[in-house]
Amino acid sequence: MSRFFTTGSDSESESSLSGEELVTKPVGGNYGKQPLLLSEDEEDTKRVVRSAKDKRFEELTNLIRTIRNAMKIRDVTKCLEEFELLGKAYGKAKSIVDKEGVPRFYIRILADLEDYLNELWEDKEGKKKMNKNNAKALSTLRQKIRKYNRDFESHITSYKQNPEQSADEDAEKNEEDSEGSSDEDEDEDGVSAATFLKKKSEAPSGESRKFLKKMDDEDEDSEDSEDDEDWDTGSTSSDSDSEEEEGKQTALASRFLKKAPTTDEDKKAAEKKREDKAKKKHDRKSKRLDEEEEEDNEGGEWERVRGGVPLVKEKPKMFAKGTEITHAVVIKKLNEILQARGKKGTDRAAQIELLQLLVQIAAENNLGEGVIVKIKFNIIASLYDYNPNLATYMKPEMWGKCLDCINELMDILFANPNIFVGENILEESENLHNADQPLRVRGCILTLVERMDEEFTKIMQNTDPHSQEYVEHLKDEAQVCAIIERVQRYLEEKGTTEEVCRIYLLRILHTYYKFDYKAHQRQLTPPEGSSKSEQDQAENEGEDSAVLMERLCKYIYAKDRTDRIRTCAILCHIYHHALHSRWYQARDLMLMSHLQDNIQHADPPVQILYNRTMVQLGICAFRQGLTKDAHNALLDIQSSGRAKELLGQGLLLRSLQERNQEQEKVERRRQVPFHLHINLELLECVYLVSAMLLEIPYMAAHESDARRRMISKQFHHQLRVGERQPLLGPPESMREHVVAASKAMKMGDWKTCHSFIINEKMNGKVWDLFPEADKVRTMLVRKIQEESLRTYLFTYSSVYDSISMETLSDMFELDLPTVHSIISKMIINEELMASLDQPTQTVVMHRTEPTAQQNLALQLAEKLGSLVENNERVFDHKQGTYGGYFRDQKDGYRKNEGYMRRGGYRQQQSQTAY
Amino acid sequence: MASRKEGTGSTATSSSSTAGAAGKGKGKGGSGDSAVKQVQIDGLMEMMRSLRHVNIDHLHVGWYQSTYYGSFVTRALLDSQFSYQHAIEESVVLIYDPIKTAQGSLSLKAYRLTPKLMEVCKEKDFSPEALKKANITFEYMFEEVPIVIKNSHLINVLMWELEKKSAVADKHELLSLASSNHLGKNLQLLMDRVDEMSQDIVKYNTYMRNTSKQQQQKHQYQQRRQQENMQRQSRGEPPLPEEDLSKLFKPPQPPARMDSLLIAGQINTYCQNIKEFTAQNLGKLFMAQALQEYNN
C-alpha cells in the first residue's frame, strides 16, 4: 500500500527500474526457499534487519526477566523501575514492532504484571505487611500499567482469552504460549526467553523448514502475511468483544466457532496462494530458465490453478459463516496481489482483474465497506500502474474503468460517513485495517483524484486535437469535473485544510478557462431572466463560475500555506476575471499579488500558467479598448517570438537540436491540452492591432526625430517585411491585413484602414472568436477613427494654416465633441502646436514646428558638432604628444568639462614623459 | 556622346567617332574579384563582340556608372577605376545622375584618379603614414575631365526635330519650385556620411590613444629595466639580457585611412551638390517672387 503511494506521488522522476528495486528488497526474503532467486545482497539486508530486531528483543526479554524476578520476591519498587525501563525499550523497538507486530512475550508480561498487581492490591493482608516504599510503588505502578495497557488492550484480551491460540502455527509463539500457560514458573520463563532468542537467530532456516513441513510450497511471504493476519484476527475479534462488553462467554463461543474455520480457511488460503503464485510464476517463466525446473515440479499444481480461478469465485460460499475471518483472507489475498506489483513479470492486467474479483467477493459477502474501499483503492492504484512508462497514456477502457471505480468509491464513502480515509492512518501498523468502530482505511482519495486528473491531461495531450477521438475524450471532462466536485464535497466535510486547498485548486484548474456562457447570457438580459420559463430558471440556478471561483480562491488565499497552490489559484482567478472581461478586478489582482516580480523563480508549469494569464489579461484589455494595457501585457510574450512555447502550446522546431530526448519528453509533458489553448493568431492580431494603434500616431508625431524609439519591435518587423515585398497584392494573411491597414492609417485614411482590419476574412480569423464580437468591432472602429485623426493631424498639420473641426469630424465620422476633445488633448500634451478658435470651431496652427528641411538641417548641425569634437580630440592627441603647444588657445572653444580634464591629464602625462 | 546606357556596372566603349580621351588599345577589366565585376566583364566582352560583329572601329576607354543623388565616391568605384586606369592609362569613369538629369540638366561627368592616388593604390598601403607621405587629401583624389559632347549631324538634326515636337510642359521641369524633396534627400545622405565620418574618427582616436598608451608603457618598461640594470651593475651582477621590445609591445593595427578619405570625398560631392542646387533654387525663388510681384 505504502509502496503505491510512493510510486504514485513521485512518479515523475522514478524510472521503472528503480521502482522495481524498491519492491524487490522487502520481498526478497520471500524467496528464501527459492535459492535461485535469492541474491547475495538481499540475504545481507535481511540479516541486518534480523539482528536489529534481535537486539531490541533481547533487551526487552532481559528486562522482562528482571521484572519476573522482582515479581517473585514481591519487590514492587524494583518492578516499577524495571517497568519504566521496559516502556522505554519498547519505544526504541517501536520501528521493529511496527514491522513485526507486537511481540507476544511483551503482551504476556503486560498481562501478567497487571494480574499480579491486581492480586497484590486485592491482598489486603499482604498490603499491610508491605513496607511504605513498596506500597507506594504498587499504587503508582498499578495506575501506570492500567494506562499503558489501554493501548494494548486488544492484544491483551486476546491473549488472555486464548493464550494458546496460534500455538500450532508459529513455533515462537508456540514457545511463548506454552510459557504463558505456565507463567508462574519462573525458571522456565528465563529459559524461554533464551529459547526465544535462539529461535529468532536461526529464524529463516527454521521457519522455512517448518513451513516446508506444513505445506510444500508455501512462501515465506505468505507465511508472514498470514502471521499478520492472525494477529489481526485476534485483534478484530477482541475488539468486537470489547465493543459488546457482554461477557467473555459469547466471545469465547465465537472464538471457538471461528476456530474451526481458521484451519479450514488456512488451507483455502494456501490453495489460493498457490494458485496465485503459480500464476506469478507463469508470468515469470519466460524470464528465468532456472526456474523452469521448479516449475516442472509444480506443473501439476499449475494445472490445478487454472481450475482454481472458479474456485476463487466459489469461495464466498465457504466464507458465508464467519465474516471477520473473511476480512482477514481477503486482506491477505490483497496483500499477496499487491506484493506482485512492480515486479517485472507481473501481468498487470491480470492483477487488476484479480482485484476486481476480490471486490466482487467482498461485496457478495457483505464484508463491510472498509474492505471494499481498501480494495478499490488498490484497483485504482493498479490502473494507474498499468502503464509503466510515464510518457504513455491510459487506454480508453482503462480510463473508463478508472473513472467508474473512483465513482463507486465515492459512492461508498458518501454512503458510509463512518469510514475514515487517510494517507497517514496506517503508517504505524499495517495490520490494523478495518477493525475499529469507525472504519479506518489507508489511502488518499485526493491523491487518486489528482493522479486521475494527471492521467486525463496526459490523454488529452496525446490525442490528436483535430480528431473525433479528442472530442470523445473531451466528453469525459464533465465526468472528471463531477468526480472532483464530489471529492471536494467529501473533503469539505472530512479533509484537512491542506487537502481542501488541494482539491479546490483542482476544481479551479478545471473551471478557470471555461467561459461561463450562462452567466454571460444572464448578464446580457437581466430583466428577461425573471420572466423566463421554469426550466431556464433551473438551468440558471447553477452557481455562477465567477462566484465559485471567488469562493474557492478566497479560501485558498486564506488557508493555504504552500506558496504554489496560492500562486496557481491567483493566476487562475485573474485568468477567469480576464476571460469574463472584468478587467479592473483582474488587473488589480495581478498588481496586488506582485507576481510579476518573482514569477521567474516559479517552476515551469506555473510560469506557463502565468504567461497564459498575462495573455488573457492583454486580450481582455483589448476588448475593453485599452490598447496600451493590452500592448504592455502582450509585449513580453510576443516580442520573444516564442509565444507558442511560452504558452505551452507546442514545441518549437528550431530548438530541437538544442535539447536532448529527455528534455523534450519533459517539455512535452508540460504542454497544455488543446482545449485550453489560446488562439495564437488571435493573440498576435490583438497585439499587432494594438501596436498599430499606438505606433502609427507615434511615428507620425516623431517622423523627423532622430532619437525616435520604436514602441513595438515586432510591429516594425512586420512593416519592414511588408515593405520588402516586391509586389504587393491584396492582403491574405492576418499580418498582411494589419500591415496594409497600418499603411492606410499612416495616411490618415481611416476608411481603408477599417476595411483592412474588419472584413470577412479577419472576422473569420479573429474577431468572431471573441464572445462579444460586435462590441469589440465597434470599439475597434472608433479607435481607428480616433487614432487616424491624430495621425492625420500629426502628418499634415504643417500643410494647414487652420482647419475646421467640422471638416475633421466629417472626415473621420466622429462627432464634434470627440474631435474637440482629441485635439484639445493633443494641444495640452504639446503634441500639436495649435490653438482652438472657439467661435469658428477651427484649429489654428501656430507653425512653430520646424519643417522637414529645418529639422534635417538641425540634425545635421548636431552631427557636425559631434564630428568636430571628435576631430578635435584627434588634434588634441597630436598636440598632447607634441607637448602642450596649443593649450592656451584651445581652452577657448572647449566647453566640455570632462573633455578638458582629460586634455589636462594628457598634458601632464606628456610633460612627465619629456 | 552618341549613345549611352543607363545602369550601374555596364561598360562604356567609345567608338572612334566620339571625341574625348582617345585610347591606344583595348583594356581588360582587371582582376574581377566580385560577382558584380564578373558581370561587368561579361557585359564588356559581350559589348566588344557585338561591336566587332557590326564591324565598328572601337576603343575601350573606360566605363560608366549611374548614381543616386551623387553618391558615387565609393571603394568599389575606386578599385574598378584603379584597375582600368592601371591597364589603360587613359581610362575614365563616366558618372551619370538620372535624377538630376530628369530635373532638367544633363548630369554627366568624367573622372580619373589622380597620379598621386594611383601611386598609393599601387602600393596598396592605406596606413596613415603612407597617406601622409603621399600628401594626399580628398580634394586630390579624383580629377574631373571636361566633357565635350559631339553628335553626328544627323543626330543634331533629329534633336532639333524632336525639340520642336515636344510639348511645352516637358521643358518647364527646369523651373519647378518643388525642391524640398531633393534637398531633404541630399541632407539625409550627407548626414549618414557625417555619421560614418564621425565613427571613423572615433576609431582613429582610439587607435591614437592606444598607441600613446603603449608608448608610455614601453617607456616605463625601459626605464625600469635601466634602473634594474644599474642596480645589478652596482652589485656586480651581469646585466639583464636585452629583450625584443616589439614582441612585448605589439603596436596596435592602424586603421585604414582610405575609407575616411573616400567619405570625405563623398561629403565634398554632396556639399557641392547642395550648393549648386540651392544656388539654382534661390535663383528660381527670386524669379518666382519677382514674377508674383509683377503679376500683382
Curated annotation (Swiss-Prot), chain A:
Residue list for modification N6-acetyllysine: K99, K644
Q: Where is this region: Disordered?
A: 1-44, 157-302, 523-543, 886-914
Q: Which GO terms describe its biological process?
A: formation of cytoplasmic translation initiation complex; translational initiation
Gene3D superfamilies in the record: Winged helix-like DNA-binding domain superfamily/Winged helix DNA-binding domain
Q: Where in the cell is it found?
A: Cytoplasm
State any GO CC term: eukaryotic translation initiation factor 3 complex
Coiled-coil positions: none
- Feature: compositional bias, Acidic residues: 166-190, 217-232, 291-300
Stretches that traverse the bilayer: none
Q: Which UniProt keywords apply?
A: Acetylation, Cytoplasm, Initiation factor, Phosphoprotein, Protein biosynthesis
GO MF annotations in UniProt: RNA binding; translation initiation factor activity; translation initiation factor binding
- Which HAMAP family does the UniProt record give? eIF3c (MF_03002)
Q: Which family does it belong to?
A: Belongs to the eIF-3 subunit C family.
Query: What name appears for this protein in its UniProt entry?
Result: Eukaryotic translation initiation factor 3 subunit C-like protein
